[in-house]
Every structure is written in structure tokens, then in C-alpha cells.
């Protein structure tokens, strides 16, 4: 039976990322099996809950794929004996039945407290957000390095760590990566990841139901507190008051605090001065919008994770057309992947332009036929008048056809309108030119790169 589990692990390794597999599957140990149940050992109760919630169905499928049989999975926590029926002890003579009931009630209360503690220890991290899946570049290198330093040695040099930057630049990814890294090293670590809004809502509910002591104890016993979008606490005096005392309690206990915001602490209106000063005690790291090269790397990383073939020219097209928001990039990639999957087509540059025409519109609507003619003429060192002429020599025909192709791709001009701009040529000549360039680009990578180089010049 152990061989079945080993084969199932091999199956899981092929479908999960290396980080996910090493964190959540590799630590599972085969203990034994019955006819229809496989018993696995887990490092901790939290680990058991996380694997049960996130990966149990996948584990069952992987096991079933080995021999076609379905098994139940039973987890045993390491260093904990499997639950057995309580040993019957001789009762002390004359112990009243009422006292026995009280003892039972006390045991039940202890069990409830244990369950409550388990729930509080669930960190709410996104397992997909790891350092391995984060693409670092010049725009985020400082924040990335600082986050790794905190994850490797929490509550030492950089406490608190304050990460700020615009929407969709990777702040949430980094704070989750810190939590996942620490949790992988120490599954028993008490980690809490909250948005500031969730912190505030939970505090309000605790006030309403008179459970503030529980609320405070929950946060102040953490080893790592991760708070996302702290700017939403601005102007909320009661929430800031409570967070201030939570911050102090954790800091004095040498526990790590990581906070994110869309602004530098001093630029957050409505944030109390005492909180600002606390944030400045540690390290403040910013994330800037990524450049084109970093955006291309992000797209390639995401496509590899999804097992999708994304050609370099398509990645460049998306990177140049998107704003600097990484979420927008991901949305474009998902849209392109979905279209390719549903239509059964390979992803190509022409497909990307068609699928993204309503998204990447701002980058193209200001491009005119005249701009394209001028750029192509300069690239080939010829005159615009020669480009528009009827001369049939090769040194003019190819540049002319390239210019016509780019006009069709980047402007809203019709075939007749383009023909008019090129010395009154008829629409059939324009169509022929477009098809000619498309065919040559499909079979000649060097030629294709030359055309793309001209396109780039139009956006710089």
C-alpha cells in the first residue's frame, strides 16, 4: 500500500508547483492502511486542517489514479496518539453524580477552547503567493529583498516592515510570501494575515458582542501579523487605537509585523502621528510600476505556471499595451488563454491583437498612417515619397508592404483609405500586401523581428 502512496506523490508532484508540493505534500508520511483507508501523518493540527481544506480532494484523485480504487484518507498528527476510547477508571467511593456532570462539562469546555485555538491559528494565506512565483526586477527589487530578509529572520532587523506602492504591483503577493515561507519552516508558527478592513469589521463585532478580550488575545499572541492596505484605517480613530496597542504588544514581545499601503506613511491622510512614527521604526520599502522587461518576465512566468505557450512577441505586445498594473497583465493573459482554449487555436500575435483590440486601444488610437510611413521610411533610409510611389524595385516594395501591413494593424483605416494614402492604390493591392507580410512573418523569424522593431519605434 505504501507504493500506492509513493506513486500518488509522484502524480501530485507533476501537477503542483515545486513550492506547494514541498510545503504541503512532501511532509505527509505514510503510516499504514486498511482495505479502504490510507493513514498519513501530518506535522501539526494546523497542517492537517490546511491540507484537508485545500488538497484532500486532489490527494484522493491522485491515489485513485494509481489503481482505480477510491480510498478514505485519515490523518494523524505527529507526536499525538490516535484517539482511543477513554480508559475507565474506578470511581472514588461516594462521588456524587452532580460532580461527575460538572467534570464532563469542564472537559467539553476544554475541547471547545482547543477547537477555538485551532481556528484562530488558520493564517488565511494564499498558497499561490510565494517568493518562487514572484518576479523581481528593478522596480521591486528592494521590497523583494526586504521581504526575504524578514521571512528568513523575523523580528530581527526590519520590524516593522512597511511596503508601499500602487494598486496591483505585488504588495499582497509579498506579504503572503513572507507568511508562507515562515509557515513552511515552522508549521506551528502563529500567523495572521488580515486586510485592515477585516481587522476593523472584526473589532466592531467584538465590541458589539462584548468580546474585546478575545479579540485582543487573538492578535497579541501571534508570531507574525500581516496587515494589508493599512490606509483604509485612516480616519477610523477607534480602529487605529486598537491597532496601536496591538502593534505595541507584538513589538515588545519581539514578534514580526508587516504592513502594506498605497502611500508612504507620511502621505496617508487621517493616519495618527503615533502610528506613523511606529511604521518608521523599521524598514520602509517601495514598489514602483514595472518596466516592459519585467512585465514580459511576469507574463512568461504566469504562462509557464499555467502550462501555456506564450510566444515572445505576444508577451511583448501585452507588456507594451498594458498599464503598469500586474493584475491587468494577468487579466489579459487569462483572456488570451481562454480564447485559445475555446477556439482550439495556438496563441499568435495576430490573435492577441484581435482579442485585445478593445483593451489595448489607448496605445493605438493615436497612431496615424502618416506616422507609420515616416517611421518605416526612416527605418529603411528611404523617402516617404518613394514609399508612396509606384516603383516596383525590391528595396521599395518590401518597405511599402510592411508599412501597409502596420497601417492595417495599428489604425482604423479601411483598405481603400490606406490605398489612398499610398498614392491611390486600389484595395486589392493593399489586401495582397497585408497577406504577403503575414505569410513572410510566419515563416521567417528574422523578418518578423524586423517588423516588430518598427512597431516598437512607433510607441517610443
UniProtKB/Swiss-Prot annotation:
Coiled coil: none
Subcellular location: Cytoplasm
Binding site for ATP: 168, 170-172
Superkingdom of origin organism: Bacteria
GO biological process: DNA replication initiation; regulation of DNA replication
Family note: Belongs to the DnaA family.
Oligomeric form and interacting partners: Oligomerizes as a right-handed, spiral filament on DNA at oriC.
Name the UniProt record assigns to this protein: Chromosomal replication initiator protein DnaA
Native organism: Geobacter sp. (strain M21)
This protein's encoding gene: dnaA
